[in-house]
């Protein structure tokens, strides 16, 4: 029978390797800090496009794909001012104390403006719960704006019965007038600002009043913008 031979030197090396594998990460984690958290739009809770976050000379990528989470590693413990900047948002800064290990700091970015906003185009769709409105922002090139923050906006409108033929028509009686509640659709590409006029607000003669003209004004921090839809359907599709 062969006897197994145990080499003390090998055992010592193995023990040292195991200890180093366990202790080094703990030592590094204790010496350096990691700052992580969520960075979102203050109103919508969506990820912020092209945000850059800086702590103690460490920064995220300037043009990273928009996600809510971020992290910065290898930061020596101490006092810092965390700064975050993004196009069309107000700058964010917060004094933080970084300790060894993980430090959670959430960032809420307040929208400043819609870039190069020149006009709006509004589309309507008659749904089960009412007339839904989709607001699209247009820039100086006549293109739809896709990257913009959520802002505090107000929408007002007047809905008129449409009288006449498809080619020749005028405004009839006033059906609805006043504020229209807006909501945010995170999944939309262009029209993330939407609104709904519930059928309960629309009192009409369903036999004779089929179409309407809707005059809209959107109040924004950059001024008022108007649009008219002249073929609003007054019935559910």
What are these regions (language model features)?
Residues 83-95:
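A short, solvent-exposed loop/turn motif at the edges and junctions
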Residues 68, 76-79, 101, 151-154, ...:
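A glycine-anchored, Pro-Gly-centered beta-turn/N-cap motif
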């Amino acid at each position: 029978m062969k006897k197994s031979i145990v080499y003390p030197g090998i055992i010592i090396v193995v023990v040292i390797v195991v200890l180093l594998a366990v202790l080094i990460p703990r030592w590094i984690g204790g010496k350096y800090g990691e700052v992580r958290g969520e960075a979102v739009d203050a109103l919508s809770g969506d990820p912020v496009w092209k945000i850059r976050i800086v702590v103690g000379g460490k920064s995220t990528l300037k043009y990273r794909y928009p996600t809510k989470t971020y992290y910065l590693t290898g930061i020596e413990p101490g006092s810092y001012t965390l700064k975050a900047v993004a196009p069309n948002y107000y700058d964010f800064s917060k004094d933080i104390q970084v300790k060894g290990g993980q430090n959670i700091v959430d960032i809420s970015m307040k929208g400043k403006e819609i870039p190069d906003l020149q006009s709006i185009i509004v589309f309507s769709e008659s749904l089960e719960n009412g007339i839904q409105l989709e607001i699209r922002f247009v820039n100086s090139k006549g293109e739809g704006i896709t990257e913009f923050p959520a802002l505090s906006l107000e929408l007002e409108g007047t809905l008129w019965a449409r009288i006449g033929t498809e080619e020749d028509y005028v405004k009839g009686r006033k059906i609805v007038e006043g504020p229209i509640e807006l909501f945010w659709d995170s999944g939309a590409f262009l029209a993330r600002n939407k609104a709904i006029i519930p059928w309960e607000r629309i009192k009409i003669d369903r036999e004779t009043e089929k179409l309407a003209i809707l005059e809209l004004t959107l109040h924004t921090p950059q001024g008022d913008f108007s649009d008219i839809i002249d073929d609003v359907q007054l019935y559910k599709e």
